Amino acid sequence: MLVTIEGIDGSGKSTLHKALGPYLADLNPVITCEPGSTWIGEAVRRAIREHADPIAEALLFVADHAAHLREVVRPALSEDRLVISDRYIDSRLVYQQVTLDGIIPDPRTWLRAVHQGWTIMPDLTILLAVPVPVALERTGKRGSGEHFEQESVLTKVQEYYMQLVEEDTARFLILDGTLPPEHILKVAGEAIRFRFDEMNRKKKKS
């Protein structure tokens, strides 16, 4: 089962992601993230820091995703493991949609086409939603020069996340990221446990 944690920077998703490993330790989850720790992931981070060409940046994210699938996600899923990833395909669909606006006609359609036929869609996506000003206060990056951390960018990203939810409501669980972390952890953790147990029951019946 593949679970992804999504949200704008400062939403609390990384805090939740780190806490889910111990909370669900009895399920022995594979805890992972995008961008990864490979040289491709480092290239992605460098591209962000150095404001690389938006198309080049998007394709680096896709390359990192391909490596992540091959090295972590596919092997774990083939063993029926629970995989929990901090960021995944939805992050590209929203963040790169912002950076590619005005450069590529209909960036989201283009991004989906790039992934078509080889990616694996999540079984459950937990989206932490917080007001953009709250997220910026948490990260201490209000007015940051990094393009992904500017208020106008995060506002669009939040909007695009909600559009994805409307397109695939069954996959998403939206949680209020302003609630206490322990409450968010309990709700998210039990939702994952329920879905994982449900999928295992269905496999045993088939």
Swiss-Prot record:
Disulfide bonds: none annotated. One of its GO terms (biological process) is dTTP biosynthetic process. Its EC number is 2.7.4.9. Keywords: ATP-binding, Kinase, Nucleotide biosynthesis, Nucleotide-binding, Transferase. GO terms for cellular component: cytoplasm. The keyword Transferase applies. CDD domains: TMPK. It is an enzyme of class 2 (transferase). ATP binds at G7, I8, D9, G10, S11, G12, K13, S14. InterPro entries: P-loop_NTPase, Thymidylate_kin-like_dom, Thymidylate_kinase. Belongs to the thymidylate kinase family. This is Probable thymidylate kinase. The lineage of its organism: Archaea, Methanobacteriati, Methanobacteriota, Stenosarchaea group, Methanomicrobia.
